[in-house]
Amino acid sequence: MFVRFGLILFCSVLPLVLSGQEPPRVKPTESIPAEIPAPEVSVKQIGEHQYRLGEIEFDSKTRELRFPVTVNMREGGPIEYLLVHENGKVHESILTTVVSPLHLQIAMKLLRYKAGHGDVFNRFLRPEAIEKEGGKETERGETVAFTFQADDKETLPIYELVIDGESAETMTPGGWIYTGSTVEGGSFMAEAEGSIIAIYLDHLAMFNMTREGADIDERWGARHTVIPEIGTKGVITIRLAEKEVTKKP
């Protein structure tokens, strides 16, 4: 089982793991995926359908992934990320992790998650350019949901950690897709920049919001009433969510 899932499938998806999606806070342009040497990784089977890659545990049946995170910010804003690597843009993120974004990308591909930005970055285009240069909603990556659990406390949908500055209310449910980052100059950019779950649209991040306001960098803040103390350890779970049709901004 390990050989079939951990090696054969890994070899089949590795070229996809390292292929880019597109570029950022302006409409991305087309790029040719860079050729990158395969990283040395070790996928270990720890259960009937459960595997471990570094600090990431994932389930080939449910397609869920879990890995450790740390509370980095609990009040104030603006914030541009829900999660970054501990060497990433920590001054703009609620959570940090020691997990390698490249390992996370590999795990996502082993679980056959589809990546793509679709029409998410169209809002950075002039209206007259959307038909020619814009992406389509059908080209989006798969819709995902995140939950956060600190120590042995209640598990929360991750959007509950965020406050919408426009309404002064908790962020509403839903709104993230797997965009998959990109490769530039031979580097997997989520690994280079440490950007994992973006709130403010970022083509270098692995996950981006589809909701209205994702292109406004000062709209979102940390919700201190539910976020535990800075330094608190926790776990993020990623799972497939129901695909939603997002109202165009």
Predicted regions and their residues:
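Bacterial N-terminal signal peptides
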Residues: 6-17
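Bacterial Sec-dependent signal peptides at the C-terminal "C-region" and cleavage site
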Residues: 16-26
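Long, low-hydrophobicity ectodomains and other hydrophilic envelope-associated domains
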Residues: 33-249
